[in-house]
């Protein structure tokens, strides 16, 4: 229900004040009676408010479904309602076979799918920007990036995390590295932030090579998407690109070890099984990846978000 309201843009239509369900139905080309039933339910859980005569208005929760607000989650809701919804319906297939549910449903991997569907890729990129907004602030507050000269954000997408780092630290320069569809829109994003003079955009595949020249290599929510074997391939390429005094920085959810302890990390791990075939990892599992690729895990820093900052250096 939340997805449908986001897809129809109901919150945007209510930006300038309450509107009748009849007008909303005409604007969205939907059935007035069925739209009323949808909005009546959403109003019962605090998303929109039902007024007299079948009028509806925004609530603080509904404001997150607007398109052009700094705290918007609209693209994230649409992403979960479209590309994510069907694969989760096939999680039984994943549990029985070990195959990624997304691949089973869409007949290709998630990143291949987005390469073939640019409109869906645009929604995904914006969704990841929205998802990462709060954790980005938490990471910036927990870690000193000012000590680096050149920071390489590997798989950095549109550049929202890199932009936040550069805005908070005057000295470092950046390299934004991702697949062509990943950095689509990055130039405009960085230009709008007045950061293009400090950040170079490089297209490429981190399974093939990673740009050299950085003294910090950031992987934010990257390894969780991949199997151990593929992670080892990425880390070997990073080891090859990195100077001897460079720093490896992985920003991810760490799966907590205690049995029976409730944790978002365990749900997130299951989500990766469904979507990418990757997995969440414990501290010990990260240490094993580092040891297999010539790195030493030197520090883990908690943040005021689900992610932690995992530091490593070359051995």
Regions found by a protein language model. Give the residues of each.
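Alpha-helical subdomain
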Residues: 1-52, 145-315
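Conserved Class I S-adenosyl-L-methionine-dependent methyltransferase catalytic core
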Residues: 1-150
């Amino acid at each position: 229900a939340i997805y449908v309201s986001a897809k129809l843009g109901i919150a945007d239509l209510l930006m300038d004040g309450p509107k009748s369900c009849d007008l909303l139905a005409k604007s969205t080309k939907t059935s007035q009676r069925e739209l009323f039933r949808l909005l009546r339910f959403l109003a019962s859980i605090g998303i929109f408010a039902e007024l007299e005569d079948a009028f509806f208005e925004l609530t603080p929760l509904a404001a997150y479904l607007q398109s052009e607000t700094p705290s918007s989650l609209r693209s994230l809701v649409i992403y979960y309602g479209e590309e994510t919804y069907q694969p989760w319906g096939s999680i039984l297939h994943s549990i029985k076979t070990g195959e990624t549910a997304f691949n089973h449903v869409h007949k290709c991997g998630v990143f291949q799918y987005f390469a073939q569907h640019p409109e869906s890729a645009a929604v995904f990129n914006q969704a990841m920007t929205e998802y990462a907004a709060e954790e980005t602030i938490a990471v910036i507050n927990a870690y000193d990036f000012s000590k680096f000269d050149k920071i390489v954000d590997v798989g950095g997408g549109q550049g929202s995390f890199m932009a936040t780092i550069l805005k908070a630290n005057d000295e470092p320069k950046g390299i934004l590295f991702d697949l062509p569809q990943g950095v689509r829109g990055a130039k405009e994003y960085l230009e709008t932030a007045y950061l293009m003079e400090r950040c170079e955009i490089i297209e490429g595949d981190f399974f093939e090579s990673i740009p050299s020249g950085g003294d910090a290599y950031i992987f934010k929510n990257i390894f969780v998407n991949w199997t151990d074997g593929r992670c080892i391939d990425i880390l070997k390429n990073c080891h090859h690109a990195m100077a001897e005094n460079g720093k490896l920085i992985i920003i991810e959810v760490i799966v907590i070890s205690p049995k029976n302890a409730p944790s978002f990390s365990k749900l997130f791990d299951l989500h990766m099984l469904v979507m990418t075939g990757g997995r969440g990892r414990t501290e010990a599992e990260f240490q094993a990846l580092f040891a297999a690729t010539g790195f030493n895990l030197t520090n883990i820093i908690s943040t005021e978000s689900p992610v932690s900052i995992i530091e490593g250096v070359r051995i």
